[in-house]
């Protein structure tokens, strides 16, 4: 996946997909009552990016639904997966369940159209804090209570805090998650990637490829340079999050990579570990 980073204004959906992204990441900020309120990142954010673009969350969901509903005038066939970067650090731990409940209610109504020919993209709920694992429980139980447990087939999970992978596994156990796991690793583009290195991403890939690992897919962020793109592909990641989708697309076209990698389509299962 080429994952467009920080797509928080509606017009940016077209912009990033047209540059080559088949996935986008959206920041979701919450109000004091744990309602998802805006698609908004805020300051500070990645270097060479405008941090303060925003929409109302439900307005963005409606636009996203159009972009991922076949037959709609705004439809993008290649946009297959959406990561919601949930900014839950503004909430108390005890609010995590409510945040999940309200997120599910909003998505059900405005994105999935109450289960009636809604948007088709796969969704990854990315949570920054392991202590907020009950967000997953709240989300899952709400879809079940509303009569749409089948929509969980479209939902995957990520803990984005760069935590120790053993701790991540424990949080999933508490949340009752046994699949659909994307593991993120990375750092803001303001810090050169070689300072932090790619070791943790390699550990995540090793977990993914082991017989008893809990990870299905690994993505690395935020990659804007040709050299870092090659390094991430060499490590065997499944997705690269970027501010410049065209850079990643160009590298994937290089002779060293174009026989080994291809862009995911809707026919690919994002929860299934790719076996060489």
Curated annotation (Swiss-Prot):
Function (record text): Dermonecrotic toxins cleave the phosphodiester linkage between the phosphate and headgroup of certain phospholipids (sphingolipid and lysolipid substrates), forming an alcohol (often choline) and a cyclic phosphate. This toxin acts on sphingomyelin (SM). It may also act on ceramide phosphoethanolamine (CPE), lysophosphatidylcholine (LPC) and lysophosphatidylethanolamine (LPE), but not on lysophosphatidylserine (LPS), and lysophosphatidylglycerol (LPG). It acts by transphosphatidylation, releasing exclusively cyclic phosphate products as second products.
Disulfide bridge positions per record: 45-51, 47-190
Protein name, entry field: Dermonecrotic toxin LdSicTox-alphaIB2
Top-level enzyme category: lyase
Alphabetic keyword roster: Cytolysis, Dermonecrotic toxin, Disulfide bond, Glycoprotein, Hemolysis, Lipid degradation, Lipid metabolism, Lyase, Magnesium, Metal-binding, Secreted, Toxin
Compartment annotation: Secreted
InterPro entries per record: PLC-like_Pdiesterase_TIM-brl
UniProt EC number: 4.6.1.-
Lineage, opening ranks: Eukaryota, Metazoa, Ecdysozoa, Arthropoda, Chelicerata
Source species: Loxosceles deserta
A single cellular component GO annotation: extracellular region
Example GO biological process: lipid catabolic process
UniProt cofactor note: Binds 1 Mg(2+) ion per subunit.
Cofactor (UniProt): Mg(2+)
Record family assignment: Belongs to the arthropod phospholipase D family. Class II subfamily.
Tissue-wise expression: Expressed by the venom gland.
Residue numbers annotated as active site: 5, 41
Catalytic activities: an N-(acyl)-sphingosylphosphocholine = an N-(acyl)-sphingosyl-1,3-cyclic phosphate + choline; an N-(acyl)-sphingosylphosphoethanolamine = an N-(acyl)-sphingosyl-1,3-cyclic phosphate + ethanolamine; a 1-acyl-sn-glycero-3-phosphocholine = a 1-acyl-sn-glycero-2,3-cyclic phosphate + choline; a 1-acyl-sn-glycero-3-phosphoethanolamine = a 1-acyl-sn-glycero-2,3-cyclic phosphate + ethanolamine
């Amino acid at each position: 996946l080429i994952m467009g980073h920080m797509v928080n204004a509606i017009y940016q959906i077209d912009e990033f997909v047209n540059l080559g992204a088949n996935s986008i990441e959206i920041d979701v900020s919450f109000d004091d009552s744990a309602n998802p309120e805006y698609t908004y990142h805020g300051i500070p954010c990645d270097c060479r990016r405008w941090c303060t673009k925003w929409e109302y969350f439900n307005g963005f969901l409606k636009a996203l639904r159009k972009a991922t509903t076949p037959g709609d005038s705004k439809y993008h066939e290649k946009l297959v997966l959406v990561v919601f970067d949930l900014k839950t650090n503004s909430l108390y731990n005890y609010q995590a369940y409510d945040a999940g409940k309200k997120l599910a209610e909003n998505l059900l109504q405005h994105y999935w159209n109450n289960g009636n020919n809604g948007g088709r993209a796969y969704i990854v709920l990315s949570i920054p804090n392991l202590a907020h694992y009950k967000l997953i429980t709240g989300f899952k139980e709400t879809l079940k209570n509303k009569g749409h447990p089948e929509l969980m087939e479209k939902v995957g999970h990520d803990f984005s805090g760069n935590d120790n992978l053993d701790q991540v596994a424990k949080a999933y156990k508490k949340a009752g998650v046994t699949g659909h796991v994307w593991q993120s690793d990375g750092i803001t583009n303001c810090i050169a990637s070689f300072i932090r290195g790619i070791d943790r991403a390699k550990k995540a890939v090793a977990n993914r490829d082991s017989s008893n690992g809990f990870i299905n897919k690994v993505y690395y962020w935020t990659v804007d340079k040709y050299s870092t793109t090659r390094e991430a592909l060499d490590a065997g990641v499944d997705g690269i999050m970027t501010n410049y989708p065209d850079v990643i697309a160009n590298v994937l076209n290089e002779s060293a990579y174009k026989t080994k990698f291809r862009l995911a389509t809707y026919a690919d299962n994002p929860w299934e570990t790719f076996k060489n």
